[in-house]
């Protein structure tokens, strides 16, 4: 059975594409820390959109999100010009920490063989 696509899914994908370009330009123009749009979730009534961004430097993510929140109105107006929507949703920017969590898990898994080898050595020394 084919998957049904709702209008909100299509609008969300289009918002993600457009915002990716707009956010990239805003970062360059306003000297914000480098971020990229990772996902956009839009409400069913299309009045609000959660925009998830990832930062190249996670330690400056709060600064980047705060800067984007300040530019939210301008970005919304730019979206209105770029998209053919009757009502452009209000933008709410959030930091997406999934990349950071994935990197943390990757580091744990990478260190696992060393940890297991050290534990085996400790067990053999005790015997």
From Swiss-Prot:
Pfam families: RBFA (PF02033)
GO CC terms of this entry: cytosol
Claim: Ligase is one of the keywords in the record: no
Alphabetic keyword roster: Cytoplasm, Ribosome biogenesis
Compartmental location: Cytoplasm
InterPro entries: KH_dom-like_a/b (IPR015946), RbfA (IPR000238), RbfA_dom_sf (IPR023799), Ribosome-bd_factorA_CS (IPR020053)
Chief location bin: cytoplasm
Disulfide bridges in this chain: none
GO MF annotation list: ribosomal small subunit binding
Any single GO BP term: maturation of SSU-rRNA
Subunit structure: Monomer. Binds 30S ribosomal subunits, but not 50S ribosomal subunits or 70S ribosomes.
Family: Belongs to the RbfA family.
Stated role: One of several proteins that assist in the late maturation steps of the functional core of the 30S ribosomal subunit. Associates with free 30S ribosomal subunits (but not with 30S subunits that are part of 70S ribosomes or polysomes). Required for efficient processing of 16S rRNA. May interact with the 5'-terminal helix region of 16S rRNA.
Protein name (database record): Ribosome-binding factor A
Native source species: Stenotrophomonas maltophilia (strain K279a)
């Amino acid at each position: 059975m084919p998957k049904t696509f709702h209008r909100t899914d299509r609008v969300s994908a289009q918002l993600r594409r457009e915002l990716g370009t707009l956010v990239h330009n805003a970062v360059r123009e306003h000297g914000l820390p480098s971020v990229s749009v990772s996902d956009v979730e839009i409400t069913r009534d299309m009045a609000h959109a959660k925009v998830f961004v990832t930062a190249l430097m996670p330690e400056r993510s709060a600064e980047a999100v705060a800067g984007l929140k300040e530019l939210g109105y301008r970005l919304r107006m730019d979206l209105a010009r770029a998209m053919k929507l009757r009502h452009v949703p209000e933008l709410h920017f959030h930091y997406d920490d999934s990349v950071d969590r994935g990197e943390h898990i990757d580091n744990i898994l990478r260190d696992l063989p060393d940890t297991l080898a050290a534990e085996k050595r400790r067990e053999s020394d005790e015997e």
